A protein has these predicted regions:
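Glycine/tyrosine- and acidic-biased, solvent-exposed loop/turn segments at the edges of beta-strands
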Residues: 1-94
Length: 94
């Protein structure tokens, strides 16, 4: 179980609701969100830039990157794609 943490401005660093974990930037915008089961990141996770713009989408299995990961540039275009297996990169495409 994650301990409750706050930024100095009182904004929560993260919040749990069921098995969903949401991390926040100090400005209150969402930094990352996904499933957190048995103290591990699982399934699809979405990461954002501090502006709120989509940055990365990827999957975890047992707290390790697994499957496709897609990173977006600041113009919302795919910057590159990677495929992971048990935390190790097995393929990268630009």
């Amino acid at each position: 179980m994650l301990k409750k943490k706050l930024y100095t401005n009182g904004q929560p660093v993260h919040e749990m609701a069921g098995d969903k974990l949401v991390y926040y930037f100090k400005n209150g915008k969402i930094k990352a969100e996904g499933q957190y089961i048995n103290d591990m990141m699982e399934g699809e996770w979405i990461f954002y830039r501090e502006t709120g713009q989509l940055w990365v989408i990827g999957n975890f299995r047992n707290n390790k990157k697994n499957g496709p990961w897609i990173r977006y540039d600041r113009n919302d275009r795919i910057e590159y794609q990677e495929t992971f297996e048990n935390g190790r990169i097995i393929k990268k495409m630009k």
